[in-house]
Regions:
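Membrane-interface capping segments at transmembrane-helix boundaries
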Residues: 127-141
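C-terminal TM-helix exit segments that contain a strictly Trp-centered aromatic cap at the helix terminus
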Residues: 27-34, 80-96
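Membrane-interface helix termini and inter-helical loops of multi-pass transporters
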Residues: 33-38, 95-105
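Individual transmembrane alpha-helices with interfacial aromatic-anchor signatures
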Residues: 102-122
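Alpha-helical transmembrane segments in multipass membrane proteins, preferentially the mid-helix core
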Residues: 55-65, 123-126
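Loop-to-transmembrane helix junctions at the membrane interface
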Residues: 61-85
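Transmembrane alpha-helix entry/boundary detector in multi-pass membrane proteins
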Residues: 12-16, 31-52
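Cytosolic juxtamembrane helix and N-cap/initiation of the first transmembrane helix
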Residues: 1-23, 153-154
Length: 154
């Protein structure tokens, strides 16, 4: 399969994209309200809610776009999402004073049915499934690296 043929937003991937889109909308709405109305209550928590919203938007767009570039961007965004939800989730339990108000990722996304905790792993699984078995083409290899069998591919 050529790089442009990586399809992350088709088949069951449509569900993954839809869930990311819903979470992107929810996180964006929540963070806008928190930052514009209550910022002084919990600035760190609210900024992290806004960061989560941006990450969900990037992941949604990249998953929907597909292709080799879309898959790489989605993988990066989802890895950041996973680290973020695990870090913020842990900190919200061990240092609750840092998170005096609820955010998307606090308590591992308890306010969202723990979807923020599960979603990055579902997203990474889907990306792996969508890109596995894809033939490596010259476009995927670093400069100067020929095919495994040599210049003629034999």
């Amino acid at each position: 399969m050529a790089p442009a043929e990586v399809r992350t937003g088709t088949g069951p991937g449509r569900i993954v994209v839809a869930v990311y889109a819903v979470l992107a909308l929810a996180a964006t709405g929540r963070s806008i309200l928190q930052v514009t109305s209550y910022f002084e209550r919990a600035p760190l928590a609210y900024v992290l809610s806004a960061v989560a919203a941006v990450i969900y938007i990037v992941a949604t767009a990249a998953l929907a776009k597909g292709g080799a570039v879309g898959a790489r961007v989605a993988t990066g965004a989802i890895l950041i999402e996973a680290v973020g939800v695990l870090t913020v989730g842990t900190l919200s339990f061990v240092q609750p004073d840092l998170f005096p108000d609820k955010t998307v990722w606090s308590h591992f996304g308890a306010g969202y049915g723990y979807l923020p905790l599960v979603l990055p792993f579902v997203g990474l699984w889907w990306l792996h499934r969508a890109t596995r078995g894809r033939a490596t083409t010259a476009d995927d290899r670093p400069p100067g690296v020929s095919s495994p069998g040599g210049p003629d591919g034999a």
